[in-house]
Amino acid sequence: MKKQKSVIMVVAKYPTTFGHTSVINYLCKGLNELGYRTAIGAFSFDADPPFNIEKIKLNKRKLLTTGNSYLDFDLIHAHQARVLYYLLSVKPTKPVVFHYHGASNKIQETNFKIAMWRYKDKISKIISVSYAGINQMKQLVKDISAEVVYNGVDTKLFNQDLPAPYKKGTPQLLFVSGLRKYKK
């Protein structure tokens, strides 16, 4: 029997800030529906993930000493620069995707620069949720290569054909994001 492909979404703390949590939850849900095994890995959890998504409490010491080899997943999908220090201190044995959601303050910008300086060449693929994110990355780190992978939308939950009582005015604009200066 063929082994089920697997992906772990990694953050420092779950639930995380702003839209990260929704992105991670719906990525896991969508991948599960496609037949993948998914989990959310974090150093601490303040809540359980929805949709029966597996939760993995990560061990900082183990990651720092053995790298990502101890994680029983085919792909490691990091959603924050700060977790890269643990995931990539030891040469990775499994591919690591870094999902850039933007840096909203100087501390996050500085952390991103340091993480990229140290680990950029160990990351298999860097993706961003928008071209604004890629532009911000390139302002912070000149020689960086990334691709846009837009946030997915569950069309059963979010759809344009809502009954009239839910629609106010014309035209309709659905905006789901955090207002950040770099998004202009």
Protein language model features and the residues they cover:
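A short beta-strand/loop micro-motif in the catalytic core of glycosyltransferases
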Residues: 76-77, 122-131
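Conserved donor-binding/catalytic core segment of Leloir-type glycosyltransferases
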Residues: 166-183
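N-terminal strand-loop element at the rim of the active site
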Residues: 3-4, 9-62
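Short hydrophobic "strand-cap" motifs at the C-terminus of beta-strands
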Residues: 10-12, 129, 175-179
